[in-house]
Curated annotation (Swiss-Prot):
It comes from Stenoderma rufum. Its main location: mitochondrion. It is a multi-pass membrane protein. Disulfide bonds: none annotated. This is Cytochrome b. It is found in: Mitochondrion inner membrane.
């Protein structure tokens, strides 16, 4: 008799995705981050749901409702910090996942890659709107500064910003709609994840060598389910340690001050996971130019498949490209550091240099190095 998991209409979908899925035998721990992101999304939706039961999206009570959650709700402090630090863990896994894709050439699966870029934008939008909800100083001023960037769009900019605000400044209408979208977007993200997996399972997974692995496949369960569970345990241990020992490590102290439109914080900055893009934005003196650079810093991922010039897919056997890749990682760390610094010498010039190098490496140096490596292969 055939196993029910192979015949039942619902179970056979799960079976073909997580049990009998043929997977390359050589997948390293860098392939764990997809499942870790799934766990992060689950944790965020669950903690967010319980937080939404106690949160009020009104400018008069939002800040106090968050205080009430932390002080009066049973384990409310745990929910709040799991949600806030869960977002940080989400982005750590996201950036490592994208980095893995760049290093091992996974971007050649263009449909999966493009849906992944959409997912990245959706998660960034969700995180930005979530940061506004506690209605602290950095929430308010971060929302004001970032939404104001849209006013750089020619002709319709000002009207667009006022339409998003629901008035002439960030106020009650803005907070209410941001809460509505912050609640809705994770479910759209979950739907996009399904599409992401659908496209991935059409082609099968890439592997560290970048060589087709059709002759050497193993079932996903038990090999990679066990490996993923180990990943879950490590990540949840790290998250628990962060939440229980230093929950405010990655937050901004200014957000413990209630939002005040009459008092601007000395340094307005977003959460740490947006600092690299914020540094690129600040590096360009022109407003519209800065906004374009900000969008392009993420959107540039969409043209990476077109810029792939190498005869080899993965960087595993391409030492010159590896050097450039790690230089790019160092530049992203530099940009993240610069984004958190005040706009003064020498930070301005460091930020501008790092921003130019970021785009140069992706657009020119990497394709040129790939062509050079192709030439060296003939020797």
């Amino acid at each position: 008799m055939t196993n029910i998991r192979k015949t039942h209409p619902l179970l056979k979908i799960i079976n073909s995705s997580f049990v009998d899925l043929p997977a390359p035998s050589s997948l390293s721990s860098w392939w764990n981050f997809g499942s870790l992101l799934g766990v992060c999304l689950g944790v965020q939706i669950l903690t967010g749901l319980f937080l939404a039961m106690h949160y009020t999206s009104d400018t008069a009570t939002a800040f106090n409702s968050v205080t009430h959650i932390c002080r009066d709700v049973n384990y409310g402090w745990l929910l709040r910090y799991l949600h806030a630090n869960g977002a940080s863990m989400f982005f750590i896994c996201l950036y490592l996942h994208v980095g893995r894709g760049l290093y091992y050439g996974s971007y050649t699966y263009s449909e999966t890659w493009n849906v992944g870029i959409l997912l990245l934008f959706a998660v960034m939008a969700t995180a930005f709107m979530g940061y506004v909800l506690p209605w602290g100083q950095m929430s308010f001023w971060g929302a004001t500064v970032i939404t104001n960037l849209l006013s750089a769009i020619p002709y319709i900019g000002t009207e667009l910003v006022q339409w998003i605000w629901g008035g002439f400044s960030v106020d009650k209408a803005t907070l209410t709609r941001f809460f509505a979208f912050h609640f809705l977007l994770p479910f759209i993200v979950a739907a996009l994840v399904m599409v992401h997996l659908l496209f991935l399972h059409e082609t099968g997974s890439n592997n560290p060598t970048g060589i087709p692995s059709d002759p050497d496949m193993i079932p996903f369960h038990p090999y990679y389910t066990i490996k993923d569970i180990l990943g879950f345990l490590i990540m949840l241990t790290a998250l628990s340690t962060l939440v229980l020992f230093s929950p405010d490590l990655l937050g901004d102290p200014d957000n413990y001050i209630p939002a005040n439109p009459l008092n601007t914080p000395p340094h307005i900055k977003p959460e740490w996971y947006f600092l690299f893009a914020y540094a690129i934005l600040r590096s360009i003196p022109n407003k519209l130019g800065g906004v374009l650079a900000l969008v392009m810093s993420i959107l540039i991922l969409a043209i990476v498949p077109i810029l792939h010039m190498s005869k080899q897919r993965s960087m595993m056997f391409r030492p010159l490209s590896q050097c450039l890749f790690w230089l790019l990682v160092a530049i992203l760390f530099t940009l993240t550091w610069i984004g958190g610094q005040p706009v003064e010498h020498p930070y301005i010039i460091i930020g501008q240099t790092a921003s130019v190098l970021y785009f140069l490496i992706i657009l020119i140096f990497m394709p040129a190095t790939s062509l050079m490596e192709n030439y060296l292969l003939k020797w």
